[in-house]
């Protein structure tokens, strides 16, 4: 599991997950089984969506798993938990001890958070995007105008609205506008090709899409039109009959598409009172977003997360990280990923920090932005921070404003933590772990933890979270024993969107999320991720799933069989290697297949090397023996 990206950097390739805790992964979900009997709890079971549809989630069973406060205390067998924020972050570490960490109870919905921030931080700088600078009051006005346009376009509460664009002010405004109108946000990975985006749009039954014009030399509009040009629909993309409108976040758009300016103008007839009434009617347990994460089946699945889950999780994240009013936050983690969106946009709204979105990871640009904008907060995968430390021009830039780094999604060397603290004098360096299915955050180190704990572990459970290390039968294991990491708490997704079978595989009847990761809990409750049960590997912080890559490569007419594994890479941590069997008579070369793959899939999925073989090793049941391929690679 995991998001496609916990936070990936564009240069590193996208993906998601496992490190989302800032680290989706920095790059970067189950169940709505919220705290039993608490206000804003009971987050599970999905919620009825627009137009009389069935619940969004597909959770197995509806019964609560009990009040987490009665669960076994930390130290019992291989379980750890944390319910009280004061236990998680002692008062000595709290920078604002009077603030209520229950963001779900404070704001109710993301729409409520946006309006509160627009009032509370009205004159503070909210977003810096190139030469554009806007205050929180101006951001609130823009979001309300976008919400009005969504309502004018026919968006109803529960409808899915997608955004396919890089980190920009327009992403922030369009996404928050859709959510304020009561829609369920569906972020699309900017590394997707047209067919990949079309699949998610079709699977989520998206009604409205916001899309960038051209990004990194690719016309997203042209890519979509090629992939969805033929079909039964009468809308802008015939192969997607439920997609009623496509809005291009630019000044021009092809026929049957709308420009951003035209779309916004359409909402001018909607009274502000109507927008605020719509926003104020959003229940806290209503779905706020669906994060699609690829799985070992090769087909993306949508983790449904509620407003209450997002607000509670990232109020806690902000508290534990020490994010504060006046911080200036360079958001390199993609907005399409849980971490970029929620530990970025949502957290900044909560604390009044300034968002400085960066659409593409480029070390020179990052260094320049840190110096010019006096950046104080810089989450990202380890590759980002290693690139900064190793840059030959580093000392020519003023980096003294940096005070907070959150990382994860990959192995974090002790030397990296020590260098960030020692050479850049960064006061707070933290690591964390999460996955899309658990709202992107499960564990997190605490300010004040020694460098050895920060580098070797992903920290302790965040408030309201239970962790269990299990054997293959689901029995809890003692401290120090490796097993699968199971998670239970208020942040577990409401289920995979309209997929009860996959939801039942992911979540036990009593609410435990099977993460598919192998980990160890130490006596202090710190979690160390040691392996992955699945074959997933992480490319620069983006989760890459062999089954999905194999399915795509298998579409090549000259490929008879293929298996993909992750291999070590000095820059990205891991990259893919494909073992492929050519069809008889084929003269396909490795370079040919790699070039073809770059045209057909997101670049982080593209194998960096290809080895042709006469056959793949298989066991008696026909399953490919990937351990043999890994052993072959090591020799």
Where are these regions (language model features)?
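Conserved AMP-binding A3 loop
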Residues: 135-138, 280-312
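Structural core segment of the AMP-binding/adenylate-forming
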Residues: 3-7, 17-18, 51, 152-153, ...
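AMP-binding/adenylate-forming catalytic core of the ANL superfamily
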Residues: 1-9, 192-198, 209-211, 378, ...
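AMP-binding/adenylate-forming core of the ANL superfamily
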Residues: 468, 479-493, 512, 518-519
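Conserved AMP-binding/adenylation subdomain of ANL enzymes
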Residues: 311-328, 336-377, 391
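Conserved pre-ATP/AMP-binding loop-to-beta segment of ANL
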Residues: 105-107, 122-123, 239-240, 247-248, ...
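Gly/Ser/Thr-rich phosphate-binding loop
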Residues: 262-265, 375-380, 389-453, 466, ...
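Conserved AMP-binding/adenylate-forming core of the ANL superfamily
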Residues: 102-106, 110-115, 120-168, 172, ...
């Amino acid at each position: 599991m995991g998001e496609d990206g916990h936070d990936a950097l564009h240069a590193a390739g996208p993906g998601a997950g496992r490190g989302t805790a800032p680290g989706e992964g920095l790059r970067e979900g189950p169940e709505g089984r919220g705290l039993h009997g608490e206000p804003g709890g009971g987050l599970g079971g999905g919620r009825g969506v627009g137009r009389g549809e069935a619940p969004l989630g597909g959770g197995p069973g509806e019964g609560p798993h009990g009040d987490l406060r009665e669960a076994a205390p930390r130290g019992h067998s291989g379980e750890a938990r944390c319910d009280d924020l004061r236990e998680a972050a002692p008062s000595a570490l709290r920078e604002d001890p009077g603030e209520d960490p229950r963001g779900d109870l404070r704001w109710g919905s993301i729409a409520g958070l946006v309006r509160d921030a627009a009032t509370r931080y009205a004159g503070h700088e909210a977003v810096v995007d190139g030469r554009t600078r806007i205050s929180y009051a101006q951001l609130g006005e823009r979001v309300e105008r976008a919400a009005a346009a969504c309502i004018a376009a026919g968006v109803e509460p529960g409808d899915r609205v997608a955004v396919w664009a890089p980190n920009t002010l327009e992403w922030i405004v369009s996404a928050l506008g859709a959510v304020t109108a009561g829609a369920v946000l569906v972020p699309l990975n900017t590394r997707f090709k047209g067919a990949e985006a079309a699949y998610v749009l079709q699977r989520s039954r998206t009604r409205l899409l916001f899309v960038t014009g051209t990004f990194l030399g690719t016309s997203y509009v042209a890519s979509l039109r090629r992939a969805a040009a033929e079909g039964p629909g009468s809308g802008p993309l015939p192969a997607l009959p439920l997609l009623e409108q496509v809005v291009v976040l630019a000044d021009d758009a092809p026929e049957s598409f709308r420009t951003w300016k035209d779309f916004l103008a359409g909402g001018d007839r909607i009274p502000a009172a109507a927008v605020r009434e719509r926003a104020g009617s959003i229940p806290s347990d209503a779905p706020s977003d669906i994060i699609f994460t690829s799985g070992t089946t090769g087909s993306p699945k949508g983790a449904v997360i509620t407003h209450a889950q997002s607000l509670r999780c990232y109020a806690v994240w902000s508290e534990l990280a020490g994010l504060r009013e006046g911080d200036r936050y360079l958001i390199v983690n993609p907005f399409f990923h849980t971490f970029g969106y929620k530990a970025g946009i949502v957290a900044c709204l909560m604390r009044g920090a300034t968002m400085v979105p960066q659409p593409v990871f480029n070390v020179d640009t990052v260094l320049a932005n840190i110096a010019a904008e006096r950046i104080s907060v810089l989450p990202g995968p380890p590759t980002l921070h290693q690139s900064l430390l190793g840059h030959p021009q580093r000392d020519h830039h003023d980096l003294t404003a940096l005070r907070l780094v959150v990382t994860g999604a990959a192995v974090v060397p002790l030397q990296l933590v020590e260098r960030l603290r020692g050479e850049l004098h960064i006061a707070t360096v933290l690591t964390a772990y999460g996955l899309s299915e658990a709202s992107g955050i499960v564990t997190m180190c605490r300010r004040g933890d020694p460098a050895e704990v920060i580098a070797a572990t992903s920290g302790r459970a965040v408030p309201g979270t239970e962790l269990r290390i299990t054997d293959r039968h689901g029995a809890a294991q003692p401290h120090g024993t490796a097993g699968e990491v199971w998670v239970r708490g208020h942040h577990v997704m409401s289920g995979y969107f309209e997929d009860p079978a996959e939801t039942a595989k992911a979540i036990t009847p009593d609410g435990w999320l099977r993460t598919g990761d192998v980990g160890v809990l130490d006596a202090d409750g710190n979690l160390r991720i040691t392996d992955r049960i699945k074959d997933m590997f992480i490319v620069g912080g983006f989760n890459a799933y062999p089954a999905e890559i194999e399915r795509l490569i298998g579409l090549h007419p000259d490929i008879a069989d293929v298996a993909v594994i992750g291999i070590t890479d000095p820059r990205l941590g891991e990259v893919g290697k494909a073992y492929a069997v050519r069809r008889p008579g084929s003269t396909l070369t490795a370079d040919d297949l790699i070039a073809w793959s770059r045209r057909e899939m997101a670049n982080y999925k593209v194998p960096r090397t290809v080895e042709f073989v006469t056959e793949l090793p298989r066991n008696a049941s026909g399953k490919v023996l990937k351990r043999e391929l890994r052993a072959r690679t090591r020799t």
